[in-house]
């Protein structure tokens, strides 16, 4: 099993030194869902929620969150992102909105945390904008789908 990298030999947390790592093109893709009542889904789909364009605001929130990840996750390196793409898929049959965030950089460390943070904040934004009509929404299935680049190479989730 690989050793945890964020702890020194005394068990103290530290930020990993990436100074000697090569700068490479790095990509990460993460996803997650929020499930809601059908009436809430209709408001989101039709853009008629009281607070405005839920999907549009969630997209901007995701992009903003990716850029602030190092401020939220204590041992995460600040990264100069070169691209952030946010996509939403609406499934009327299950009243579910899926969010997928793709992050890219050319740097010394990966962008997985940025993609995951973007997804979470997008889904939290949807919850915030719709909670007045549906407090029972469920956020779930948040996961990394793939990462590319760096010393550890490529990884794609099974399934």
Curated annotation (Swiss-Prot):
Principal EC category: lyase
Pfam families, A to Z: MoaC
Reaction catalyzed: (8S)-3',8-cyclo-7,8-dihydroguanosine 5'-triphosphate = cyclic pyranopterin phosphate + diphosphate
Residues that coordinate or bind substrate: 75-77, 113-114
Organism domain of life: Bacteria
CDD domains linked to this entry: MoaC_PE (cd01420)
GO molecular function, one term: cyclic pyranopterin monophosphate synthase activity
Keywords (A to Z) from UniProt: Lyase, Molybdenum cofactor biosynthesis
Keyword Lyase: yes
Active site: 128
Disulfide bonds listed in the record: none
GO biological process entries: Mo-molybdopterin cofactor biosynthetic process
Pathway(s): Cofactor biosynthesis; molybdopterin biosynthesis
E.C. numbers: 4.6.1.17
Function: Catalyzes the conversion of (8S)-3',8-cyclo-7,8-dihydroguanosine 5'-triphosphate to cyclic pyranopterin monophosphate (cPMP).
Sequence similarity: Belongs to the MoaC family.
Subunit structure: Homohexamer; trimer of dimers.
This protein's name: Cyclic pyranopterin monophosphate synthase
Protein source organism: Cupriavidus necator (strain ATCC 17699 / DSM 428 / KCTC 22496 / NCIMB 10442 / H16 / Stanier 337)
Gene name for this UniProt entry: moaC
């Amino acid at each position: 099993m690989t050793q945890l990298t964020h702890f020194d030999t005394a068990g103290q947390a530290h930020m990993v030194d990436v100074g000697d790592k090569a700068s490479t093109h790095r990509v990460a893709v993460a996803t997650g869902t929020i499930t809601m009542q059908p009436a809430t889904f209709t408001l989101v789909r039709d853009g008629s929620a009281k607070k405005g364009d839920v999907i549009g605001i969630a997209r901007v929130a995701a992009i903003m969150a990716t850029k602030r990840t190092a401020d939220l996750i204590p041992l995460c390196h600040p990264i100069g992102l070169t691209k952030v793409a946010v996509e939403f898929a609406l499934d009327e049959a299950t009243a579910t909105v899926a969010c997928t965030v793709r992050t890219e950089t050319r740097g010394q460390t990966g962008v997985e945390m940025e993609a995951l943070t973007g997804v979470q904040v997008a889904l939290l934004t949807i919850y915030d904008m719709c909670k007045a009509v549906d407090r029972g929404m469920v956020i779930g299935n948040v996961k990394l789908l793939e990462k590319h680049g760096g010393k550890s190479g490529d990884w794609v989730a099974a399934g």
